[in-house]
A protein has these predicted regions:
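Sec-dependent N-terminal signal peptides
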Residues: 1-8
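C-terminal segment of classical bacterial N-terminal signal peptides
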Residues: 11-19
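Secreted, propeptide-processed cysteine-rich mini-domains
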Residues: 21-35, 69, 76
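Extracellular disulfide-bonded cysteine-rich modules/repeats
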Residues: 39-47
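Acidic glycine-/aspartate-rich tracts in secreted/extracellular proteins
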Residues: 49-51, 170-173, 265-267, 343, ...
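Zn2+-dependent metallopeptidase catalytic core
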Residues: 71-311, 315, 467-470
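Non-catalytic C-terminal accessory/binding modules of secreted extracellular proteins
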Residues: 80-83, 144, 283-304, 369-484
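Extracellular hydrolytic enzyme modules, especially secreted metalloproteases
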Residues: 257, 265-410
Length: 484
């Protein structure tokens, strides 16, 4: 399945956002309650007489994992992660050169400290719920991967998948480096991504050859491979030719996805990031799932391929090429890796489809009143994480608990709560089928990042009332009942 071109305008035109001027005790500020970090302290804007001024401030922790909440969640997410692995710093600096563009990327996994619920609220027993099969909406059309299907079940779950890197050295540049040295930080993030999202164990593997494989052609010999685009005959021939060159040197046994890279010194304008595949035959069998990656080239200014070098969009494209996830369009705001623009981890439903979650972590809700305790989606835990309401054979409502941490460590505290959204598998448009459900308050926030329901908030959707009745570091307790 193809990642359509509308993604380019959303990811390559990275926004810039205003931030508060550096705070100083007694200096004027603009709005009561806002906070700002300066010189190792967190200052809060307070009312003093008829004026608004910054208070004396409180010393902040040295760890940037404990970010300070901002007025605009998107401004908060734009902050540069100074604790990112050092190998990503050239990309971070490259991004800053573009008018100090917003860096929405996550670069690492930050463990979430889950606590055990110690309250007295009784939740609905699993035996009183529907079977998980009742909530597994079936995909029967050619649209994006929103539901279960034979195509989905035939794919190896991410937690058990094997990805083969095919590093080629074209006549455009002769490298003295190695693929692992040049791209190891990306593959380490990829392995961390799968391992930490797989609550039930992982044997995921990225296979990286020791050196680049000689491919005696130039990228310029192939038309229409230079940008993010739809499949082309020239691009498919490129895949066939490079595999023919690599086949004598690589054992493709058990492979699920082929990742093509070239030395980062190659001009990024010669090769676009593309998730579409080509049927190729090797000594070990036939394969057709490919992900071609733009060179990590930071020397040629900002071009049409530049936005695809960052970790978030690389992972986004990977989930196009493997599991055929579509773009969730703007129906989710910034929620979900497959949304546009994506600023968070995968949605819980996507994780379930991809095999990161098991059936035991899903609560399929009946029409009768139910109460569920949901463990935060960022916690490394086999606890129940999704509550799903089956509306009909093609539509469900999904409920999950959101906290700061994991790969969502750049979210502000104001984004914590209960995320509610609708899945409609009747949609065949690659950019539709997933829709956020929230209050007027939540939908009015930047990128809808304030959409999660807070304590005592309620929404009504498709005849069901969804309420948050308790919350904490254990997650959220949610009450669901039919209204009609």
């Amino acid at each position: 399945m193809i990642a359509f071109l509308s993604i380019i305008s959303l990811f390559l035109t990275l926004p810039t956002f205003p931030v508060n001027a550096a705070a100083k005790a007694g200096a004027k500020c603009s709005k009561a309650g806002i906070t700002s970090v300066a010189s190792g302290k967190t200052y809060t804007c307070v009312k003093s007489g008829k004026k608004l001024v910054w208070n004396k401030g409180v010393a902040t922790t040295k760890s940037v994992d404990q970010f300070v909440d901002q007025v605009q969640p998107t401004t908060f997410i734009c902050k540069t992660d100074t604790l990112a692995p050092a190998a990503w710093k050239p990309y971070q600096d490259y991004l800053k050169l573009r008018n100090n563009a917003c860096d929405m990327n996550f670069y690492r996994f930050v463990p979430f400290e889950l606590t055990v619920y110690s309250g007295t609220q009784i939740t609905t027993a699993k035996s009183d719920l529907l079977s998980t099969e009742s909530c597994k909406v079936k995909k029967t059309n050619s649209g994006p991967m929103l539901g279960f299907s034979s195509q989905q079940s035939n794919l190896t779950p991410y937690s058990k998948a094997k990805f083969q890197v095919v590093p080629i050295e074209t006549t455009d540049y002769k490298s003295t480096s190695t693929p692992k040295k040049d791209y190891g930080h990306y593959f380490e993030l990829l392995e961390s991504w799968v391992k930490n999202n797989s609550d039930n164990g992982s044997s995921f593997e990225v296979r990286i050859p020791d050196k680049y494989i000689t491919f005696n052609k130039s990228l310029k010999d192939y038309k229409n491979i230079d940008t993010h685009n739809k499949p082309t005959p020239e691009g498919q021939q490129f895949h066939k030719d490079l595999i023919a060159a690599a086949d004598p040197f690589i054992d493709f046994s058990g492979n699920d996805l082929i990742i093509v890279v070239v030395p980062p010194q190659v001009n990024q304008n010669l090769l676009g990031t593309n998730p579409w595949g080509t049927q190729v035959t090797t000594q070990e069998g036939s394969f057709w799932r490919f992900l071609t990656i733009t060179p990590f080239d930071f020397t040629n200014g900002w071009g049409p391929n530049s936005g695809f070098i960052g970790p978030q969009l690389l992972l986004h494209e990977m989930h196009h090429s493997y599991f055929d996830f579509g773009d969730h369009g703007d129906g989710m705001g910034g929620w979900g890796l497959m949304s546009l623009p994506s600023v968070t981890d995968l949605l819980g439903w996507d994780k379930y489809l991809a095999g990161y979650y098991s059936d035991q972590q899903i609560r399929c809700l009946p029409s009768a009143k139910s109460i569920s305790l949901l463990t935060p989606n960022v916690a490394k835990s086999q606890n129940e994480k999704l509550a799903v309401i089956p509306i009909n054979s093609s539509k469900i409502i999904v409920i999950e608990s959101v906290r700061v941490g994991g790969f969502n460590y750049k979210l502000p505290k104001s984004s914590e709560g209960v995320l509610v959204y609708e899945i409609n598998i009747d949609e065949t448009d690659y950019h539709k089928g997933v829709y956020l459900i929230s209050t007027a308050r939540g939908l009015s926030t930047d990128n809808k990042l304030g959409a999660p329901l807070r304590l005592n908030e309620t929404v009504i959707a498709s005849g069901y009332k969804i309420s948050v009745i308790q919350t904490g570091n254990f997650g959220d307790i949610v009450e669901v009942q039919k209204t009609s």
